[in-house]
Amino acid sequence: MRNLLANYILRIILLFIIVIDVDNVFCQSLPMYSQYMYNMVSINPAVAGSRGVPSFTGILREQWSGLPGAPTTKSFTFDLPLNEKKMGFGVQMFEDKYVNYIKRTGINLSYNIKVQVSDNGVLSLGLKGGFYNDSKSLTDVNLGLGRSYDVAYASNINRIIPLAGAGLIYMDDKFYAGFSIPDVVVFNKNIKTVSDNNLFQVNELHYFFTSGYSFDINEEIQIKPSFLVKSTKGAPIQFDFNTNIWLRNFVSFGGSFRTGESVLAMAELQATPQLRFGFAYDMPFKRPNSNEVFLRYELGRLFPKSKSYKSK
């Protein structure tokens, strides 16, 4: 019965993705990570606490290396299981910078409930909420020779914007599949700070669907393919196809293909049972390369660890 329920839920998720696929496409208004599969709390609140122990995760991403003012993203996440691992909680702090003049700094909290739907499978339903400070130092922008004033850059913008999201995910010790909307706060309005400033800004819904599987080739080799589908209004749907090969649960090498954008190489090192490092090198088709570093520390010695999907 539980296996039938799990299969039914997964079919509903896939059907919903097909429905929204008709009208929605993806754009890059939300920062994305190449190593998202190792920090899925950042895109799906239902994942918080799924590793069974308190975990600290940090990611630093530098896009378009070598270009002055290139975008950078910093994220720090802490998550843990609660109530005998029937619930999960997480907190994420982040900072996104664009061309030195635009910055988003924020925090959000994630909470989920976990339901056992099969012998090894758990379905999690999660919500998140928080806020970020949207800062635009427009008066610092160099308008170039012969231009000292522009109405679009006449004043700075500094405001607090609420953030809320939702998601669900099914996990067992080999497989996962999840759907999430990282930010359900939608706005489409004029931001007026002074009489001659009329800066237009839009925030659309983003839909994420992700899935992955762990193949045990033998006791020393595991192959872990995964994919991520991103959809929003106003841009083409984007797919990330990823494969990682783990050797002796110690070191991993892999790669990804992001449709219409880039290919990338990844490597991870499980330095200790609690400490993991990762590095990703993005090679976009039309822009300079990008770098991303990842670190996770688990408090596994203080808390007994439960089963979790092996590639997280």
In which residue ranges do the predicted regions lie?
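Subset of outer-membrane beta-barrel
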Residues: 28-312
